[in-house]
Amino acid sequence: MAAGLATWLPFARAAAVGWLPLAQQPLPPAPGVKASRGDEVLVVNVSGRRFETWKNTLDRYPDTLLGSSEKEFFYDADSGEYFFDRDPDMFRHVLNFYRTGRLHCPRQECIQAFDEELAFYGLVPELVGDCCLEEYRDRKKENAERLAEDEEAEQAGDGPALPAGSSLRQRLWRAFENPHTSTAALVFYYVTGFFIAVSVIANVVETIPCRGSARRSSREQPCGERFPQAFFCMDTACVLIFTGEYLLRLFAAPSRCRFLRSVMSLIDVVAILPYYIGLLVPKNDDVSGAFVTLRVFRVFRIFKFSRHSQGLRILGYTLKSCASELGFLLFSLTMAIIIFATVMFYAEKGTNKTNFTSIPAAFWYTIVTMTTLGYGDMVPSTIAGKIFGSICSLSGVLVIALPVPVIVSNFSRIYHQNQRADKRRAQQKVRLARIRLAKSGTTNAFLQYKQNGGLEDSGSGEEQALCVRNRSAFEQQHHHLLHCLEKTTCHEFTDELTFSEALGAVSPGGRTSRSTSVSSQPVGPGSLLSSCCPRRAKRRAIRLANSTASVSRGSMQELDMLAGLRRSHAPQSRSSLNAKPHDSLDLNCDSRDFVAAIISIPTPPANTPDESQPSSPGGGGRAGSTLRNSSLGTPCLFPETVKISSL
């Protein structure tokens, strides 16, 4: 026992001595003391998803929204949380930035939405980490290019319809840039395409050797020299068409300076200029070489097909977007050509009858070898020349193959962007067509029901209900809206303009009104306004309550969509559905088939000097009203016509 105690006692003493420095230090504070330092937990509620973090974590970046006192504007005292109506998935990356100091860009999120979230929280895009910075910039550049191309396509392509008062230049430019807008533009589009093809084919055919007849010499001559008159007439017709097109485009261009600097304008000038120079320059031996050189430029007419081919335009956009990669390829090839041409010249310099007479002469061999063509007109004969020729061939394959995937990816990207843009435009056209069709269909059905007596009154007194027969929910709601409009405006629905006509509607009196006000009522003997207040007949502008436009009393107003007409009572009219003589009107029906819509008429302010009492909708002297529609027979027109608007 004593031996065992003597064994472990030195170790115990050593351990006690080791603990002495720690025992002299004060004990750590209790857990409750830590909360008094001011480091508290903040709860951030982002669209219902709660995030918790330390206050000191957010205070690291005081120039941002969460790190500054501006976040107190979003504090909810009832729940004790900071509420932000933003994207919670995006906020996760924002909060990680406060924790780690590195901002990461999510791949699955839209880059534009990510930028909007950064702008809201006061973070700059330069804070994106190095791991995501390159991809972030590429995606942002691609998105900017796509938006710019879509905007340009909308401006030059199937944009919105031109207003009714558009100028001749605007209509011409729209016809040139979008031939499918009208039949005449489409015909001109195909005519110019036909003459472009004729010009290119004639330029090729005139160089084919043609044999003469048996009686004449059998010496072959080009077809252009044997039949000069025919080719001159074809060339003249084509150039006249191209000249007329160019002048019309120049006249209709929104910016003529920009049009003159465009690539297609230069192509048009190069295509037609040789013809006019050939007419002015005399044909003699001194200028024959220059004349032949000018005729070569006629081949550039083939680039006019780029206006008629979407694939050629995509190829042009691809080459434009790959300018940096193509520049790198050209620079690399130039360096390799100079190096290998120099090596091949000195390797073949000592041989007899060598074709490598100089370094520029060796350029041809190097270019043909690096592009893997290998014509065989120049070949090395020494062992060193063959070795360096093999290295030149392999290096050419590597240098040329490197930029190809980048060009292919850009072409695929631009092609799919154009496909998506075309699809969006087609979907927009279909959507607008469906809206017009549904609107026109329900309107015509409403008029037909009125003509056939399909709409009847049921009930009496304040229990007015509109009975319908075999109609869809959309039709029922639309008909109910028109019915309520009739009751509140004291006029029957007669006709509805089309969608495009309604957008371009112009008031006959030069005035517009944004609400169905009392100024839209007819003024005359026996009308509602004249019977209640004769001063309304004066043409004096007033400001109505709940109205943003100043209207004129006693003037005929054209507001938006509908037209009303007062005339005598007819057997099939629904005069009982309009305003009643008493003041209590049931504006909505109690049927379950409809969505109630309350439509109120703004009334003049009570402090108007010349109006003591508002007019009653059921004033005396109001004649019965009937239906007027062009499809229902010849209507009887009366001079008191007023147009009312749909809501």
Curated annotation (Swiss-Prot):
Q: List the Extracellular topological domains.
A: 206-230, 285-287, 346-359, 380-386
The record describes the protein's role as: A-type voltage-gated potassium channel that mediates transmembrane potassium transport in excitable membranes in the brain. Mediates A-type current I(SA) in suprachiasmatic nucleus (SCN) neurons. Exhibits a low-threshold A-type current with a hyperpolarized steady-state inactivation midpoint and the recovery process was steeply voltage-dependent, with recovery being markedly faster at more negative potentials. May regulates repetitive firing rates in the suprachiasmatic nucleus (SCN) neurons and circadian rhythms in neuronal excitability and behavior.
List the expressing tissues.
Answer: Widely expressed. Highly expressed in brain, in particular in cerebellum and thalamus; detected at lower levels in the other parts of the brain.
Chain ranges for the short sequence motif Selectivity filter as given in the UniProt record:
372-377
Which GO biological process annotations does it have?
Answer: action potential; potassium ion transmembrane transport; protein homooligomerization
A GO CC annotation recorded here is: plasma membrane
Please give the residue ranges the record annotates as the region Interaction with KCNIP1, KCNIP2, and other family members.
2-20
Q: Does the keyword Ribosomal protein belong to this entry?
A: no
> Which residues are annotated as modified residue Phosphoserine in the UniProt record?
S458, S555
Where primarily located?
Answer: membrane
Q: What is this protein called?
A: A-type voltage-gated potassium channel KCND1
Positions that bind Zn(2+): H104, C131, C132
- Region span, S4-S5 linker: 310-323
Matches recorded under InterPro entries:
BTB/POZ_dom, Ion_trans_dom, K_chnl_volt-dep_Kv, K_chnl_volt-dep_Kv4, K_chnl_volt-dep_Kv4.1, K_chnl_volt-dep_Kv4_C, Shal-type_N, SKP1/BTB/POZ_sf
Query: Which residues lie in the membrane yet do not traverse it?
Result: 360-371, 372-379
Keywords of this entry = Cell membrane, Glycoprotein, Ion channel, Ion transport, Membrane, Metal-binding, Phosphoprotein, Potassium, Potassium channel, Potassium transport, Transmembrane, Transmembrane helix, Transport, Voltage-gated channel, Zinc
Query: Which classification does the entry list for the species?
Result: Eukaryota, Metazoa, Chordata, Craniata, Vertebrata
Q: Which family does it belong to?
A: Belongs to the potassium channel family. D (Shal) (TC 1.A.1.2) subfamily. Kv4.1/KCND1 sub-subfamily.
Assembly behavior = Component of heteromultimeric potassium channels. Identified in potassium channel complexes containing KCND1, KCND2, KCND3, KCNIP1, KCNIP2, KCNIP3, KCNIP4, DPP6 and DPP10.
MF terms (GO), sorted A to Z? A-type (transient outward) potassium channel activity; metal ion binding
**Region called Disordered, residue ranges:** 144-163, 506-531, 601-634
Give the Cytoplasmic compartment stretches of this protein.
1-183, 253-263, 309-323, 416-647
Q: Which residues are glycosylated?
A: N352, N355
Q: Where are the transmembrane segments?
A: 184-205, 231-252, 264-284, 288-308, 324-345, 387-415
Free-text domain note: The transmembrane segment S4 functions as a voltage-sensor and is characterized by a series of positively charged amino acids at every third position. Channel opening and closing is effected by a conformation change that affects the position and orientation of the voltage-sensor paddle formed by S3 and S4 within the membrane. A transmembrane electric field that is positive inside would push the positively charged S4 segment outwards, thereby opening the pore, while a field that is negative inside would pull the S4 segment inwards and close the pore. The zinc binding sites in the N-terminal domain are important for tetramerization and assembly of a functional channel complex. Most likely, the channel undergoes closed-state inactivation, where a subtle conformation change would render the protein less sensitive to activation.
